[in-house]
Amino acid sequence: MSKILKSTTLGNVKNGGIFKALGKKFVKLDADEHGCLVLAKDIWTKMPFRDGDDPECPNDLRRSDVMKYLGNCLAEFTEKGTPLDTFIPFKIDLQDTTGQTEYGTVEYRIGLLTLRQYGKYWRLIPKVDTPWWLATPYGTPNCSPYTVGSSGVWDVNTDGSNYSSWCDDSFGVRPALYFPSTLWVSTEDEGEAGFCLADVPLDDLLAEIKSRAEE
């Protein structure tokens, strides 16, 4: 049995399914009327959550070096021709472990999963060989002074367990995004080699599209 690539829309990929889009592999976590929540299958880079001194809010995603990196990734995708509306804005709740909400809720086109989201979807997420950052702060400046960890950020270990680590540790960045359910993606299918869109000659494909448009 050989693996063949099949083209389909993201809406047809089951939750937990692996697919390829924009030259990257992702796992689909969930879907709603707005689109599909996906997570990078692999680590894109390894870096501190925030490097350097920031005595006020060192574990605030909004001020993090990770978000600067992800902003650059988004810019690279659009510069290479991917429409900006491929990346649907989604909200990230920055509530800390103790329930403090001073960091608020932010909206990005590319970001990180929260601790609560990881708790919901962990069964669907493939393990990787390096720990990776979540968006959730362990504590914030407004939390109880007896709560240690106002510089801590939650992360996922290689075995899938959760830890809180200092924001200047170097861990993996595994982006979360929201894609349209209509986005065309590629999936691997094990079976006898059969029809595969990639095998169709371009002229035949264009002719078929034209004929269907004229119907």
Q: Which role does the model predict for each range below?
A:
Residues L206, K210-E214:
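Residue-level detector of alpha-helical secondary structure
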